[in-house]
Amino acid sequence: MSQLKVTLIKSAAHRLPKQRTIVKELGLGRVNSSVVLPNNEATRGAIFHIAHLIEVEEVK
């Protein structure tokens, strides 16, 4: 299964509480922090909600 590298591009400050929670649950802290996550439905659902704050690239 492939994996996704998720990088926080914009700050989660002054965003909806749900969006801030998703950023923390994905393991992203500060701007420009990155994390590698499995490419599954749960991850893609979370990414959908904060797509305007992050950058996603596929890692093999």
Swiss-Prot record:
GO terms for molecular function: structural constituent of ribosome. InterPro entries: Ribo_uL30_ferredoxin-like_sf (IPR036919), Ribosomal_uL30_bac-type (IPR005996), Ribosomal_uL30_ferredoxin-like (IPR016082). GO terms for biological process: translation. The keyword Magnesium does not apply. GO terms for cellular component: cytosolic large ribosomal subunit. Keywords: Ribonucleoprotein, Ribosomal protein. The keyword Lipid metabolism does not apply. Pfam families: Ribosomal_L30. Belongs to the universal ribosomal protein uL30 family. Part of the 50S ribosomal subunit. This is Large ribosomal subunit protein uL30. It comes from Pediococcus pentosaceus (strain ATCC 25745 / CCUG 21536 / LMG 10740 / 183-1w).
